[in-house]
């Protein structure tokens, strides 16, 4: 597979080939008849502003040591996940099959509907609102988005949203440093 090749999505299992797969317990079945229509982009770092550790992965696997950092204490009972995490170096992890509902959006609305987890795929980018995202992340995100757009016809470049778009009173990620024009342009350039 070349660097620009799409990731094969197994429509039976929901797993994407070529990615590191770490199954999260923080997911469940989508409601009957629900189809993927949007991709929601998030920004995350644990501790805030620190990159490269395994805390985000541990959070999504319910293995975070809350005593490892004072900022982790409020996360003690939190059960969250996303379908994907893109690290600063562009490595992509998959936690939840795309056929399942990951617990990433929280209280939110999109396309005039609530319960966004029902019809979305969540992609976490390792980062913060105030730090520009890395070139490697944009390249990996472009390949992933195009692979998902090819798999799910209802998803288009116009159906890429930030967490801040679907929960504006609660969330600000992926933040003002995220290059939305590039993201949308790259999502269609690879097709």
Specify the residue positions occupied by each region the protein language model found.
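Conserved beta-strand segments that form the floor/walls of ligand-binding pockets within enzyme
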Residues: 85, 122-124
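Basic/polar, cationic surfaces and motifs that engage anionic cell-wall
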Residues: 2-15, 33, 114, 119, ...
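Residues immediately flanking
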Residues: 43-44, 125, 164
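Conserved, mostly hydrophobic/aromatic
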Residues: 41, 123, 141
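N-terminal catalytic cores of peptidoglycan-degrading enzymes
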Residues: 1-114
